Design a protein with these regions (language model features):
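C-terminal catalytic "cap/lid" subdomain
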Residues: 1-170, 174-199
């Protein structure tokens, strides 16, 4: 299942699947996108920490920035959970009582998520910016964000393409950049072609 996700299929809980893989838990899955016996999942050796295993582009990702009193930001994150809007890559900051958060919401199952977030903030003391023209590209690999060479390569490829990314963040399983939607495929191809072991 994780391999399917690394190759672009939408996986709703990649962290849980990665946990199962690392702890020897057997998962069984069947594909619903084609006729036949379903997807055969085979055992592969762990690719190693710090090695890129895939590059993905996500057109269902929607970057958002919110600003306001800390209490509003806290309430906002609680509301996201109760509204069923999935989010990731949240970065919070606070200064002199004012707070802000940058995050990415998943619009696959909540296509109106951006509008719902903007509506929620319209009645508060804060502000909300929904970046509808941005999507995300991710270099996938356990511990990949700890590799300075990967950050450098990702930045160099963006520069060579003339693409400006307003945000690049690392997580336990990838390095994600916000990319203008019309350049997403170019970035995914360039990263894939230049990463050792993928190109």
């Amino acid at each position: 299942v994780l391999e399917m996700g690394l190759r672009g299929a939408k996986v709703l809980a990649p962290e849980a699947i990665d946990y199962a893989r690392r702890h020897g838990i057997t998962l069984h899955a069947r594909a619903s996108f084609t006729e036949g016996r379903g997807t055969v999942i085979t055992h592969r050796p762990h690719p190693g920490v710090g090695r890129a295993v895939a590059v993905t582009g996500d057109r269902t990702a929607l970057p958002i920035t919110v600003r306001g009193p800390r209490s509003d930001i806290d309430t906002f994150f609680e509301w996201l959970g109760s509204a069923g809007i999935r989010w990731k890559d949240a970065r919070r900051a606070e200064s002199d009582g004012a707070a802000s958060a940058e995050l990415v919401i998943d619009t696959l199952n909540t296509p109106d998520g951006g509008e719902r977030v903007a509506d929620w903030w319209s009645g508060s003391k804060g502000s909300c910016t929904v970046y509808t023209s941005l999507k995300t590209a991710t270099i996938v690999g356990e511990g990949i964000a700890e590799q300075a060479a990967v950050w450098q390569l990702a930045s160099e490829r963006l520069t060579s393409l003339g693409v400006v990314s307003p945000s690049m963040v690392g997580s336990a399983w990838g390095l994600t950049a916000q990319i203008p939607e019309d350049r997403l495929d170019d970035v995914v191809r360039a990263w894939h072609a230049h990463l050792p072991g993928l190109g």
